[in-house]
Structure formats: C-alpha cells, structure tokens
C-alpha cells in the first residue's frame, strides 16, 4: 500500500482527472498496463507522490488482480464497483468516465451544501 503522502495526493479531484486520462488512452487503443506505465512515467517526471500509487496498481495488476481490486483502499467503494463491473463487461473506458462523473457530481453537491 502506498504511503500516507501518496494516498493523500490521490484525492477525489486527482482521481477524477486520472479516470478521464485513462479512459481517453483506452479509447485510443492503448492497453491498461501501457496506459498506467505512461501515467507513472509522467508522475516520475513531475516528481509526484502519485508514482507510488501507480506502482502499487501496476503491481496488483501484475499479480492478476482487476483494476477495481487494485484500487481497493485507495478509491471509494462506488468507484471500485463501477470500475470493476465495467472491466468485467469489457467497457472499462466507459466505466472510468462514469466514475469520474460520479466523483465530479459528489464534489459539486458538497460544494453547494457548504
């Protein structure tokens, strides 16, 4: 599991952005492992703590886990369920976009309540 700083950096806003990026890469026919390695490389270039999150996810995927299972403990239950079911039905890009929309909607609702 990534350290506390990496998990804090992997916040709702960042996850929403990452899900959109991953979806776009997958829609352009890039494989999931390739897309995650690319995002990890970009994080390394920026010296971002997200490198540890990407490394964790890639490690779990390398051990045969699904993306949803790899995100367990890093993302909300709703996200992991949406992403897992989308991956199971071979519609991962759509599931990632849906997860991003859910995060954005929840954030918008929270902001309107405050």
Language model feature labels by segment:
Residues 1-114:
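Catalytic metal-binding core of the metallo-beta-lactamase
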């Amino acid at each position: 599991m990534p350290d506390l700083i990496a998990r804090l950096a992997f916040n709702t806003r960042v996850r929403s952005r990452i899900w959109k990026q991953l979806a776009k890469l997958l829609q352009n026919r890039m494989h999931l492992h390739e897309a995650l390695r690319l995002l990890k490389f970009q994080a390394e270039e920026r010296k971002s703590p997200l490198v540890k999150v990407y490394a964790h996810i890639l490690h779990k995927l390398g051990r045969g886990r699904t993306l949803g299972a790899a995100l367990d403990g890093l993302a909300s239950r709703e996200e992991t369920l949406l992403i897992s079911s989308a991956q199971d039905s071979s519609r991962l890009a759509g599931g990632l976009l849906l997860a991003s929309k859910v995060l954005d909607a929840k954030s918008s609702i929270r902001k309107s309540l405050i």
